[in-house]
């Protein structure tokens, strides 16, 4: 219980939450940096451009947890991308992959998910814990300072 309280105390600092959420959102891009077979400049741009946009978005709110929830669509896509990187090794999300989600029967889905258990567990640990920290950030009275 003492260790859990220490972790909670760390995430009461809104600046740490800010940097943690940026790291969570850019994680799939960093993973694709190592798996994609494109030129180095394209892979660097694949990290720097989204990171700049996420950073800009997070500066719009004094509580990073609010912006994390506003960016939930990107959190969902990031989680999906990590599972696909585990499954295929490379390639970003394609439209037909979303169509396959709706047309696959339950037996095939169960078999596929059992093979993806490590990736799904990683996504749950990273992004669900991020959602919990986002709620704690919103409920926290401390805000990001304007000088930050």
Q: Where are the predicted features?
A:
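Transmembrane and membrane-interface helices of multi-pass
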Residues: 2-148
